[in-house]
C-alpha cells in the first residue's frame, strides 16, 4: 500500500478559454450539459465525428480562436495517491505525481502552476510499468522536444503540445522494444495528465481513466480502449484483428498499450491492430472544476465515474485531504470486490474544498397588541 500527498502554491498565467459541449454516456441518463462557457474573450467550436471522438464520455473541445482570458481563476494544485496490490501475486501498477514541474525539472521555464501525473497498469509482468515510471518524464520533457512555453498559450502551442505527447508515447513504445529486461509479452497502459496554468491535457492509451469533477458532475476525460468501445472495435476489425471473449486477438484486454511487441512485430507500424498512439483531450479549467481522478481499471471495473466523483467529493468536504480521498476510493472498490491491483490519484484544483451552502433560517416576526403585551408582562411579573 502506497500513499502520498503533495501541494504547491498558486500563481498567475495568461490562458485561453474554451467553449465545450458535453454529452454523457448511455448509462448516465440524467446528465446533459449543453454548453459550458467561461468568457466571451475566446470561443472554441466543437468538431469531430462519431468515428473519432476526442473525449471520454462525449466531450469534445477544439480551439479555433485564441485570446487572453478575462477570468481570474488560477488553480491551486494539491494531490494525493493510493496504490494497493490487492489479491494479485505481483504489483504491476506504477504511477507518477509531480505537483511542481518547474521545481522538479529545474531547467524548464514552465508557467505556474504546472504539474504532471501518470498511471501505468502493466500486464505480463511489472517491468513495462516500471520502465514507464522511470523514463517517461525524460521522454516527455527531453527526448520528445517539449515545446517552448509562450507568454500566451495559443493554438500553435497547443498543437505542438499534443504532438510532443504523441511523440513521447511512440518513443516509449520503441524504447521498450529495445529494452532487454522487458519481454515481448510484457506491456502497460499509459494515462497522463499535464496541467499548465489553467490548461489541462489528458493523454490515454489503454483502459485507465481520467474523470473530472465539474460541480459534482463526472466528466470523462478519456476513453477505455477495450472491445466495448465501438470506434476501437471498428478500427481493430478494419485492420484484420478480432476479439475473442473481449480480448484482442484472444490475448489482450486492451486495444492500445505501450510494449507488447510480440503482438506488434508481425505487422508494420501502420497496420498493427495494437497501437501505442494515445487519444488526447484538452480543456480549460474553470472555477467549476473541483478535482481530477486518475485511476486504473481496478477502480473502474466496480465503480462508475459518477460514483467515484461523489465518493471523492464527499471525502473532500469531510476532511479536505486528497491522499485520504484516494485511499477511501480504493477501499470502496475493495468493498465492491475488486481483486485487481489498484492505483488512484486525486488532483485538487483549489486549496480549500467547496462546501455545500447552508440554507438560511427564516426570521419570523410577530405583531403583539397592547392588550396582549400587558397580559404577558403581568404573567411574567407573577400577578
Curated annotation (Swiss-Prot):
Residues at which Mn(2+) 1 binds: 121-122
Domain of life of the source: Eukaryota
UniProt entry keywords in alphabetical sequence: Hydrolase, Magnesium, Manganese, Metal-binding, Protein phosphatase
Residue positions binding Mn(2+) 2: 121, 297, 340
Catalytic function, reaction form: O-phospho-L-seryl-[protein] + H2O = L-seryl-[protein] + phosphate; O-phospho-L-threonyl-[protein] + H2O = L-threonyl-[protein] + phosphate
Disulfide bonds: none
UniProt EC number: 3.1.3.16
SUPFAM superfamilies membership: PP2C-like
The protein's required cofactors: Mg(2+); Mn(2+)
Any one Gene Ontology molecular-function term assigned to this protein's record: metal ion binding
Protein name as catalogued: Probable protein phosphatase 2C 13
